[in-house]
C-alpha cells in the first residue's frame, strides 16, 4: 500500500513539474525590462517595451487567435463571408484591406504599436513597416504546431 501511495505522489509531482512555467529564452522578458520578447517565424526577435495598445492583424486566420485571447485591435484585414464570421468585438475595427492586398497607408493610419502578419502573404509589407519602426510579428498558420505556437505568442503579446 505504501508503494502505491508513493507512486501516486511521485506521479503527481511529475505532473506538477510539467505544468510549471518554463524559462523560454525566445519568449521571456528577461532582465531587459521589456514587456515581452518573442521570436516570430522568421527567427526575428521582437521586443515590446510595453503592452501593445494598438495592434493591427493582417490575416483573417491570425485574427482568430487575437479573438481567442480577447485581444483589442486598432485594425484588421477584410473578413469575407467564406472566411467565417467576424467576432462582434471587431465589427467596428478599421479594415486595412484584403489579406492579399493590405494597404500600407491604411495600416500606418491606424498608428499601430504592433502588427501581426502572415508569413504567407506579408514578408514585403513587414519589411516596410519595420522601416517605419513598427514592430511586426510574422507568423505561419499551416500546421497544428503553428497553431499552438501562435496561440502562445499572441497570448504573450496580450498578457
List PLM regions with ranges.
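Early extracytoplasmic/lumenal segment of secretory-pathway proteins
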Residues: 37-47, 96-108, 124
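Bacterial Sec-exported substrate-binding components of ABC uptake systems
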Residues: 3-5, 9, 18-61
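Extracellular/periplasmic catalytic domains that process cell-envelope and extracellular macromolecules
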Residues: 48-49, 108-109, 129-131
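Solvent-exposed, acidic/flexible segments
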Residues: 56-59, 100-101, 118-122, 140-147
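Loop/turn elements at helix/coil->beta-strand transitions in domains of secreted/extracellular proteins
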Residues: 53, 72, 111-113, 132-135
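N-terminal hydrophobic signal/anchor transmembrane helix of membrane proteins
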Residues: 52-71, 144-158
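Extracytoplasmic substrate-binding proteins
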Residues: 35, 45, 114, 124-159
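A short, structured surface patch at a secondary-structure boundary
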Residues: 60-110, 114-119
Amino acid at each position: 500500500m505504501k508503494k502505491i501511495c508513493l507512486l501516486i505522489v511521485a506521479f503527481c509531482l511529475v505532473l506538477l513539474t510539467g505544468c510549471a512555467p518554463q524559462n523560454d529564452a525566445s519568449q521571456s522578458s528577461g532582465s531587459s525590462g521589456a514587456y515581452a520578447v518573442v521570436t516570430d517565424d522568421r527567427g526575428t526577435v521582437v521586443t515590446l517595451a510595453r503592452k501593445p495598445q494598438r495592434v493591427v492583424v493582417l490575416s483573417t486566420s491570425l485574427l482568430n487567435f487575437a479573438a481567442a485571447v480577447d485581444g483589442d485591435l486598432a485594425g484588421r484585414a477584410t473578413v469575407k463571408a467564406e472566411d467565417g464570421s467576424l467576432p462582434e468585438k471587431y465589427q467596428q475595427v478599421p479594415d486595412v484591406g484584403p489579406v492579399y492586398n493590405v494597404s500600407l497607408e491604411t495600416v500606418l493610419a491606424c498608428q499601430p504599436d504592433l502588427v501581426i502578419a502572415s508569413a504567407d502573404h506579408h514578408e514585403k509589407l513587414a519589411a516596410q513597416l519595420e522601416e517605419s519602426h513598427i514592430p511586426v510579428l510574422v507568423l505561419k498558420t499551416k500546421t497544428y504546431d503553428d497553431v499552438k505556437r501562435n496561440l502562445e505568442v499572441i497570448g504573450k503579446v496580450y498578457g
